[in-house]
A protein has these predicted regions:
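Bateman/CBS regulatory modules and CBS-like beta-alpha motifs in cytosolic regions of diverse proteins
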Residues: 1-27, 31-33, 38-40, 44-45, ...
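Gly/Ser-rich helix-loop-strand patches that form or flank binding pockets
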Residues: 120, 124, 138-147
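A short, polar/charged loop-to-alpha-helix boundary motif
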Residues: 54-70, 143-148
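Acidic side chains
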Residues: 6, 51-52, 95, 141
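Residue-level detector of secondary-structure transition/capping positions
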Residues: 29-32, 52, 61, 121
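Short hydrophobic beta-strand motif reused across regulatory alpha/beta modules
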Residues: 46-51, 135-142
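Alpha-helical structural elements
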Residues: 63-64, 117-119
Length: 148
């Protein structure tokens, strides 16, 4: 029986709850990270994803940024996009993070976790042990493991 630890990605970038929007974008762009767990006082409090940024209230930039799997594709910018992006730059991680995410343990049965991800319509699960984030499992990770 495979466990979460067999497929989880431990190469994880976390951010602080007070990190600015501009720095979040910089990390996502430079590191290719689409999901950034948010830590406050050593505790996991949320996750900032590309989707959180793209659909943030009425200020969401309409794509010139397209999310495709774990890739960000930037299209030519326009004035409206720049205006919306500037409005978002006043936010910090805790303003835009999701607090609805699936938490699993390294020892959890992988088949059960996959079922939870699919049935509950999550794109990922965070691996947490003793209140510490240890890794992440994304749908992309699962597909890659199937073909390796």
């Amino acid at each position: 029986m495979k466990q979460v630890r067999d497929v989880m990605n431990t190469d994880l970038i976390t951010i602080e709850a007070n990190l600015t929007f501009d720095n979040i974008l910089k990390i996502m762009t430079e590191k290719g990270a689409g999901k950034l767990p948010v830590i406050d006082n050593g505790q996991l409090v949320g996750v900032v994803t590309r989707d959180d940024i793209l659909v943030r209230q009425e200020t969401a930039p309409l794509p010139p940024v397209i999310a495709f799997w774990d890739l960000l594709i930037t299209l030519p910018e326009n004035k409206e996009f720049k205006k919306k992006l500037k409005k978002l730059s006043g936010y910090i991680a805790k303003d835009i993070m999701s607090t609805d995410y699936l938490v699993v343990k390294q020892s959890d049965d992988l088949a059960n976790v996959i079922t939870q991800i699919v049935e509950q319509k999550y794109n990922y699960a965070l691996v947490v042990e003793n209140d510490s984030i240890e890794g992440i499992i994304t749908k992309t990770d699962l597909i890659k493991k199937c073909f390796n």
